[in-house]
Amino acid sequence: MVKKVAIIGAGISGLASIRNCLEEGLEPTCFEKGEDIGGLWKFSDHVEEGRASIYRSVFTNSSKEMTCFPDFPFPDDFPNFMHNSKLQEYITMFAKEKNLLKYIQFKTIVSSVNKRPDFQTTGQWDVITEKDGKKESAVFDAVMICSGHHVYPNIPKESFPGIKLFKGKCFHSRDYKEPGIFKGKRVLVIGLGNSGCDIASELSHIAEKVIISSRSGSWVMSRVWDEGYPWDMLFITRFETFLKNTLPTVISNWWYMKQMNARFKHENYGLMPLNSTLRKEPVFNDELPACILCGIVTIKPNVKEFTEDSAIFEDGTVFKAIDYVIFATGYSYAYPFLDDSIIKSRDNEVTLFKGIFPPPLEKPTLAVIGLVQSLGAAIPTTDLQSRWAVQVIKGTCPLPSVKDMMNDIDEKMGKKLKLFGKSDTIQTDYVVYMDELASFIGAKPNIPWLFLTDPKLALEVYFGPCTPYQFRLVGPGKWPGARNAILTQWDRLLKPMTTRVVGSPLKPCLFCNWFRPVLISVVSIAALIVLF
């Protein structure tokens, strides 16, 4: 009997889940609150309650070769980093190519998801939905939650004494759409994440004054990396990951900080993280350093107190006559349709095995797709998550015991806290995490075997960027075009930029990218031995 799967949300996680259910012979039904697919990437001029929202000028932070669905490369002429409308175009192309739209019920709200009385034996769920004021109930063999984590804005007003006295306007960055109304205004942006930096940089060209207040600082990276290549094509590699995880901590931290400071010294710009060794996801902004250098954006410490029209910072300085306060303070994740006892949260900690499965469930028929954050792109991550989840739901890939899953969660949590800090406990190392998931379903590339049988491909897989195609080389859902996609990925990267041909477009030397850090590390270790 074919298993029926309810999928909540038709963003990238939902589409990946629909597609992978179909590949494995399951029967998906996707419930989408809005009128279209795309989730976060579907721009709207107005904010809808219960839906993710972006501003008009949002661009991707991951390049196209690292962002695509693993068997559906972006068209050659698409830019490497793209406007949200361009990514939405690609998402629509994917959904139509894979014939996914007919499995989606639009304008449908999921009201509740509850275990059936016989859940211990069947693993089934009662799902109640609402459309046009009419409620319906249906039974599903499994549920995949794909509603994202950019829905419920976090506005910690209790952390800012006097904010209730402030007479200007204050709102969350989720409500920001475009800069027009801020012309000639004085704006305080609280938060140094991607949204805060994007908004501050955009407003700096039209507002009278823009200040960013940051409690802990952040690394700020450019999308343009060494020799002009996209940052992630050089930064996210298997060899880079190997070095990062095997070198002595003092060397690894030193090299990481050197990479982060390669473009500019963060101390000089007031951006340096309080704990500079944490591997928190950096901010991606090509404009902010120039805005600071030109004096059109100012960085300040945390706000100590608000008055009726001013903000007093912890260093004693005051920003007066503020018109707007924008809280770019992130989001809280919540599942209002689900009993809290199923997915427990401790502080900012989610109790999910590999960020997907709640360990205590008697039957592993509930999966959360797209909650985990990593330095890698969301699309390939959610694709691999849903591939594994589908195998678990089918019963072909059993989970470990509850005890083993909880031990794994606790072990990983300790490592995450050390690497990323307490506020980013759903963050994880991209390559390590992807390999873990891939190994569960036999989709992890066998690097030693590749070097023996296909050295040309092996060099690209190990020393080149860890592109999504690598996870469709083998295993269920393997793609015959994966090898060629890997060997031609640099051609697609260069294609949209060669609009004025001057000589031959140059691909990077893979060995040069890793030889330098190895050499520096060896010299550093030798120096430490000599000195101590």
Swiss-Prot record:
It catalyses: trimethylamine + NADPH + O2 = trimethylamine N-oxide + NADP(+) + H2O; N,N-dimethylaniline + NADPH + O2 + H(+) = N,N-dimethylaniline N-oxide + NADP(+) + H2O; hypotaurine + NADPH + O2 + H(+) = taurine + NADP(+) + H2O; (S)-nicotine + NADPH + O2 = trans-(S)-nicotine N(1')-oxide + NADP(+) + H2O. The keyword Transmembrane helix applies. The modification Phosphoserine is found at S401. Its EC number is 1.14.13.148, 1.14.13.32, 1.14.13.8. Keywords: Endoplasmic reticulum, FAD, Flavoprotein, Membrane, Microsome, Monooxygenase, NADP, Oxidoreductase, Phosphoprotein, Transmembrane, Transmembrane helix. It is linked to Defects in FMO3 are the cause of a fishy off-flavor in cow milk due to by an elevated level of trimethylamine (TMA) in body fluids. This is Flavin-containing monooxygenase 3. It comes from Bos taurus. The gene is FMO3.
